[in-house]
C-alpha cells in the first residue's frame, strides 16, 4: 500500500493541517516507508512459531505487597478548602 501526495493532502485537510510542498513530499515519503515496513511484517512466515508472553525466559523477583505509606487523608483534608464526611467538596461545574 502506498499513498499519493493527493491522498496525503486530503488527510492533511481533514486533520486541519496545512502542508507546504516540502512537508507534503517528506510526509508522503515517510508514510510510504512506514507502510512498506508494515507490509514486510505482514509477509513474514509465522506458521509454527509459538506466541510468547515475555521475551525473556526468566522471571522477575517480586517484592512483598506491603503497605509502606501511612494513612494521611485527615492531614490532606485539613488543607482542603471544603470537606464533608471525609469527601472533598468542589464547585459545581455541570448541572
Swiss-Prot record:
Assigned EC number: 6.3.5.-
GO terms (BP aspect): glutaminyl-tRNAGln biosynthesis via transamidation; regulation of translational fidelity; translation
Organism: Ruthia magnifica subsp. Calyptogena magnifica
Keywords attached to this entry: ATP-binding, Ligase, Nucleotide-binding, Protein biosynthesis
Keyword Ligase among UniProt keywords: yes
Protein name as catalogued: Aspartyl/glutamyl-tRNA(Asn/Gln) amidotransferase subunit C
Reactions listed under catalytic activity: L-glutamyl-tRNA(Gln) + L-glutamine + ATP + H2O = L-glutaminyl-tRNA(Gln) + L-glutamate + ADP + phosphate + H(+); L-aspartyl-tRNA(Asn) + L-glutamine + ATP + H2O = L-asparaginyl-tRNA(Asn) + L-glutamate + ADP + phosphate + 2 H(+)
Subunit structure: Heterotrimer of A, B and C subunits.
GO molecular function, one term: glutaminyl-tRNA synthase (glutamine-hydrolyzing) activity
Enzyme's top EC category: ligase
Organism domain of life: Bacteria
SUPFAM superfamilies noted in UniProt: Glu-tRNAGln amidotransferase C subunit
UniProt family annotation: Belongs to the GatC family.
Summary of the function given for this chain in its UniProt record: Allows the formation of correctly charged Asn-tRNA(Asn) or Gln-tRNA(Gln) through the transamidation of misacylated Asp-tRNA(Asn) or Glu-tRNA(Gln) in organisms which lack either or both of asparaginyl-tRNA or glutaminyl-tRNA synthetases. The reaction takes place in the presence of glutamine and ATP through an activated phospho-Asp-tRNA(Asn) or phospho-Glu-tRNA(Gln).
InterPro entries in the record: Asp/Glu-ADT_sf_sub_c, GatC
Nucleotide-binding recorded as keyword: yes
PANTHER family, alphabetized: GLUTAMYL-TRNA(GLN) AMIDOTRANSFERASE SUBUNIT C, MITOCHONDRIAL
One Pfam family cited in the UniProt record for this chain: GatC
Gene coding for it: gatC
